[in-house]
Amino acid sequence: MKNIVLDKSPRILEAIEIIKNTNFNDIPDGRLEYPTGIWANLQTYYTKEDALFEAHRKYIDIQFILAGQEKIGVCDFSTCTENIPYDEEKDIEFLDAKNFEYIEMKTGDFLILYPKDAHKPSISIDESPTHVRKLVVKVPV
C-alpha cells in the first residue's frame, strides 16, 4: 500500500479526529451519523475462519479495533474476480482473490482502505473465534 498524505486528505483527518475524541465504550452498536457526510458503523462480533473480499466505490473505510484482535486480508482490487456484483445502494461488491496479504489488527490499531483496496475483515488470527468490537468509519470519496 502507498503512503498517505493526511494534510491533503481533510476528510480522513476529520474522521481520525472523530475516532480520537469519542469514547465509544458507552455507545451501543449501530450506525453513527456525522454532519459532513461521514458515518460510522459500531459493531461487536466474533471473528470467522474465512470470508469473501469486499470493495467499495463511494467510501474510504477506516477500520478501528476498539477491543480484541483480527486479521484483514488486503489486495489490489484490479487483481480480484467478481463473486457477487456491485450493489450501488449498499456500496459493496464481493470478490475472490488469490494473491493477498493479511494485516494483523489489535486493540487500538486502525487501517485505512481506499476503493482500490479489496479487503476481507473479521478473520481469526488463529483458528478460534475472537470477540471484537470495531468501528468502521465511512469517508466519502
Q: Where do the PLM segments sit?
A:
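A short glycine-rich, His/Asp/Glu-containing loop-to-beta-strand
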Residues: D29-L66
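His/acidic/aromatic-lined binding-pocket segments of jelly-roll/cupin-type domains
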Residues: I60-F64, Y102-I103, F110-L111
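Glycine- and acidic-residue-biased ligand/ion/polar-headgroup-sensing regions
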Residues: K58-I60, F64-I72, T79, D87-I92
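Short alpha-helix capping/helix-loop boundary micro-motifs
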Residues: K58, L95-F100
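Conserved metal-binding segment of the jelly-roll/cupin
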Residues: E104-S124
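A short hydrophobic beta-strand segment most commonly corresponding to one strand
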Residues: F110-I112, P129-V141
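Surface/interface-facing alpha-helical segments and adjacent flexible terminal/loop regions used
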Residues: M1-D29, E33-G37
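Short beta-strand/loop turn elements enriched in aromatics
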Residues: L32, T36-W39, Q69-P85
